[in-house]
């Protein structure tokens, strides 16, 4: 969904949340929550790998609270992404 200058992507996360905001003009991306690990593996990871190929990055990652349906996908992303100086999936600005 695009609203003016913002693209909003809501990944399927069952009872959790996994939302990516892309401010198009500024080319700034915010990931809010990561859903369950299955959300990350099935939807978020493939999307991040695709946009990373074109040089995109996550400028900010926000975890709203530590319930597993909000944080487990983020935990898996951070585990798999590795060192921030040499990310395996996507560059992340701030968490």
For the regions a protein language model found, what residue spans apply to each?
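Conserved beta-strand hairpin/beta-sheet module of binuclear metal-dependent hydrolase folds
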Residues: 2-57
């Amino acid at each position: 969904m695009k609203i003016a200058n913002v693209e909003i992507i809501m990944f399927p996360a069952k009872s959790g949340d996994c939302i990516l905001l892309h401010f198009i003009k500024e080319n700034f991306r915010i990931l809010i929550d990561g859903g369950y690990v299955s959300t990350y593996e099935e939807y978020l990871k493939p999307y991040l790998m695709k946009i990373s190929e074109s040089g995109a990055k996550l400028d900010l990652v926000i975890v709203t609270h530590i319930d597993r349906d909000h944080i487990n996908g983020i935990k898996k992303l951070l585990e798999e992404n590795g060192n921030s100086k040499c990310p395996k999936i996507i560059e992340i600005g701030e968490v």
